[in-house]
Amino acid sequence: MPLSKLTLFYVRTLALGALLCSSFVAQAKQVDVHDPVMTREGDTWYLFSTGPGITIYSSTDRVNWKYSDRAFATEPTWAKSVSPKFDGHLWAPDIIQHNNQFYLYYSVSAFGKNTSAIGLTVNKTLNPKSPDYRWEDKGIVIESVPNRDAWNAIDPAVIVDEQGAAWMSFGSFWSGLKIFKLNSDWTRPAEPQEWHSIAKRDQVPTGTHSSAGPGEIEAPFILKKGDYYYLFASWGLCCKGANSTYHLVVGRAKNVTGPYVDRAGKDMNEGGGSLLIKGNKKWVGLGHNSAYSWDGKDYLVLHAYETADNYLQKLKILNIHWDQEGWPLVDEKELDSYQSRRQK
């Protein structure tokens, strides 16, 4: 039976709608972030990224994201006194709840220098529409000084141990990754101070504390799972487009301060670290992760550079699975299957 004009109208309308829909999906932009961390308030997720003032996005499903705010409208007042070459970009945040507030740690530095400091700003809520929304900067938590310190005060991540004490891991290049106990209000190191080295690669030669050295390791993040603390770290180089060699390794320990060992039993302080994920031709420069347990499942949050988009950094959230020996596994195929969408 021949189609009526009305039927033809509906067919053409549906076809046009499908075409427009597919075009929208194809053109939907992914969220471009670096060094992502996340938290949740109510039914909303908040994502924090390196950028001017620390970029914040919000989502109710961890796929569709809207720009929310920046934690700083202008740079911290003390930033240039610590790092004269600071360019306004706050690096490598960490977000955690404490005392009914959200604690946002961040890094002030200049590329390749350890003229660096980790700062803290706090807020009662992450909802920018709330009358209680206001970031209050608490200043410097720790600072590294060239020719004094053989470490770099960037890339903070806070973990609470089984006794309720808060510890901050941090570090990039130089003599590797460190961890120290925070005081009761999480604003400074606890006294007397307790510091530990948790991972390093090549040693920095004596007398060259102003140089990063060859030890390509940074961005520690610790996740407690079962009987172990799992230390994730980024090896290699970021921020070099097609030449980026960033990839993720992991070790574990029974104590938050270590020693962290890899699958072969090698101490991460002696260069140990088991490969977790390296990427492929489509996705390079994988790294600077965080890791979380949400609603009974475990997730790895990281950035990856997309080759097809001129190596622009994209948000990736991957499922963490665990093998019979209790080691984390992630599926490289999820780099393709997880596609964030930035909403207007």
Regions found by a protein language model. Give the residues of each.
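Bacterial N-terminal signal peptides that target proteins for export
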Residues: 2-14
